[in-house]
Structure formats: structure tokens, C-alpha cells
Amino acid sequence: MASTLRLSTSALRSSTLAGKPVVQSVAFNGLRCYSTGKTKSLKETFADKLPGELEKVKKLRKEHGNKVIGELTLDQAYGGARGVKCLVWEGSVLDSEEGIRFRGLTIPECQKLLPKAPGGEEPLPEGLFWLLLTGEVPSEQQVRDLSAEWAARSDLPKFIEELIDRCPSTLHPMAQFSLAVTALEHESAFAKAYAKGINKKEYWHYTFEDSMDLIAKLPTIAAKIYRNVFKDGKVAPIQKDKDYSYNLANQLGFADNKDFVELMRLYLTIHSDHEGGNVSAHTTHLVGSALSSPMLSLAAGLNGLAGPLHGLANQEVLNWLTEMKKVVGNDLSDQSIKDYLWSTLNAGRVVPGYGHAVLRKTDPRYTSQREFALRKLPDDPMFKLVSQVYKIAPGVLTEHGKTKNPYPNVDAHSGVLLQYYGLTEANYYTVLFGVSRALGVLPQLIIDRAFGAPIERPKSFSTEAYAKLVGAKL
């Protein structure tokens, strides 16, 4: 029988903090793999690249630090700072026409280049995490080692389990998720080291360890919340020889369906990062800039993600589609859908899942999910309805004339896929989004600490002060 990895979190942390190579053997997804000095770990890879990255930033600021990179209008100040260039975010850049690139790679390129599970079609999110932190596409061995390391760090403290168990089932899953992540502050290596006094150059080491521990524990936390609120409260243990997405699917209770496991791999990858200006990413960065631990920083980001304008859109899409079917009935003709779209707009409501603050074309994250559905569930009635709306809505929204982007975003599709595979509890979906988003925001937090990023402190003005600034009388 293949051996499985059995390495305590404390032993793993002490070994990695000390810079010692961790030798481990694990049968990963049926393939035996070994992590030794021959294969660079994620931490070693990042540490090797760090001096060169620091030098690039130093040179850029020295030679061009006084260059103007943009202008700010009064409308932007009042309009949520849309389009204001003022954040540094290494992992991804969003182009309004092309969509997201992760370290320069499009989603189709990531699907092609990032390692997959044996027999799988979708990239493993472990590979994307590696890419976001280092800028390099990892080898299959490196991804398997990272999966094994997260599995080794996954055990939850007893008090976290008890904390979740004590939450009333009526408490929103996102509130429970944020609560549990906040409570993991008790385990923070960074907080403990900072309290004792450490050199600033060591900040990133402890931030890395906290981030790895935190990510490793998120599937069990998320699954425990789901099983407590919607099922029997029983959660399967992490399987040390399986990848991150498989374990999440298994703990939720859906691993018997290989296609659902593949969906989780795709979902966790494409929802992870979308530049640094969105609420969850910016909040995590902002709170982290005060040297709060990764636990407190991510919890703050999760609270932002829980807002209706950020992470609840896929739930609203499902509600809107369900309402349409009730109103329209069996006559789901193009004209009836067009009429329903107009009734939504004329009632002063938005069409959920359409439009984006930055994008001006169809979201490639939507496209990747659509392609998945075309392969796996082409005859599903809800998928057919989503496809029909996709054909009709852009024209209606363009004619309506009040949106800069009449095309679908990522939220227009994800809920329908989850529903198809039996995960029907829509108010839980944002928790899955939160697990994924951690994979995008925590690499930047590690980078922030490694670069010595300062506390964020923009300038604010009152309306009267702005009026004076622009020469207006109120």
C-alpha cells in the first residue's frame, strides 16, 4: 500500500523556517512522488527570485520615481476611484478588452500550461498559487509537493472546530467563515514572532508560513460550515494523497463525481485573483499593510467579499433565472426572454451577471465555464437558458444604453454549474469564492512583506475642500 505523508504542521514549519530541506514521500493521486533537495520548494523558489525582484523595483523607482502615471478627476474621487492607478499588484493585470492575465498568462494559457491531476483536464489551483507568487509555471512534481504540504498543514485546532459547531445554523455561512479565519490568529507565526521582535527582512518568512497554514485549513473550515448548516455535520478527513480541490470536493460530499472535482479545480483557479482593486483583494492588502497577520487580513477581505455588490452576484443570477422561469413559464422563446430583460431594466433593476467595472468584453472566466458546460452538461435546461440569455442580453443592454459593458461576467455562469452537480444551497456559494480568493490575495501579501511595502494612507478631502480645490462655490 502506498505510504501517505504524515508530517506535523509544527515540524513542517520549524523545518521550513530553518531553511532545511523537507524529505517526504507521498502517493499523490496514485503517483508516488518525493520532495527532496532535488526539487525546489515554493519557498526556496521565491527566496531565490526575491533579490532580483527587489533590485528591479529599486531601479524602477530610482530612475522613474517622479514620473506621472495618471490623472485624477473629481468624478473618480466620488465614483469609487474607478480607473485610478495607485496600487501595486504583481499576480494579475486586467485588460478591459482582453480580460485577466495571471503573471502574463491568459486563462486558456493557464489551462494549457499549468499541471493537471492524472487524467484531468483543468489546472490544479496549486499551480496557479505557485505562478502568482513566483511568476513561474511549476513542474508537476512541484505542484504535487505543494498539494502534499497543504495536506500536511490541514489539521484544525480543536477550538476552531468547536467555534464553528457553536454557530447557529441561521448565521450566514460567510459570517461563520470569517469568524473561523479570524480565530486562527491564535495560531499565527507572524503575530507571535512580531511580538517577540524580528528583523523586517524576516517578515515575509513568517507571512509565508501563516499563508500556507491558512490556505491548508480553508477546505476543512468551509466544508464544516457546509455540513453543519445543510447536512449532517460530519466532515471527511483530508486525504493526504489527494490534491487540494479533490479534498474540498470530498469534504463537501461530492467527490464521487469526477466532473464536480474537475469543476472545483477550474472554479478555484479562475476565481482566485482579479487585480488588486476589487474589494476583497484591496481590503486584504490594506489591512495587511498595517502588519496585521494573514489571518486577520484575509478575514477582512472575506467580510468585503460577503457584500452583495461583490461576492453575492452568482446567487443573484440564480434567483433572477428562477424568477424568469416562473414568470415566463414554458415559453422560453427568444422574444419572451427579451421581454423579460426589458421588464427587469424598466423596473430600475440590473441584469445580474452582466457588466463589469473594468471589462468591456465577455469575461474569459465566463467563457471557460461555458466551455466546461458544453463538454459536461450540454443538455441541461438551466445551461441552455444561460446560453439563450447570453445570445440576447448584450443586444438589449446595448439598446438600453446605460452600461459600458453589455457582456456576461464570471457570476453569470458559476451558480448554474454548482446547481447542476447538486450543490444547490446558493447562500453558501460565496464561501467557495472565499477559498479561491485566498489563493490570489495571500501571494501578494507575502510579496508586500518581502518588498517592505508601507502602510496604505491616501489623502481624503471633504466636499467643501474639493470645491475649493476646483474653484467651485457651493
Curated annotation (Swiss-Prot):
GO BP terms: carbohydrate metabolic process; citrate metabolic process; tricarboxylic acid cycle
Catalytic activity, EC: 2.3.3.16
Keywords annotated in UniProt: Mitochondrion, Transferase, Transit peptide, Tricarboxylic acid cycle
Top-tier EC class: transferase
Chief site of localization: mitochondrion
Keyword check for Mitochondrion: yes
A GO CC term assigned to this protein in UniProt: mitochondrion
Entry-linked Pfam families: Citrate_synt
InterPro entries, sorted: Citrate_synth-like_lrg_a-sub, Citrate_synth-like_sm_a-sub, Citrate_synthase, Citrate_synthase_AS, Citrate_synthase_euk, Citrate_synthase_sf
GO molecular function, one term: citrate (Si)-synthase activity
Localization in the cell: Mitochondrion matrix
Transit peptide residue numbers: 1-35
Family listed: Belongs to the citrate synthase family.
Miscellaneous: Citrate synthase is found in nearly all cells capable of oxidative metabolism.
Protein name stated in the entry: Citrate synthase, mitochondrial
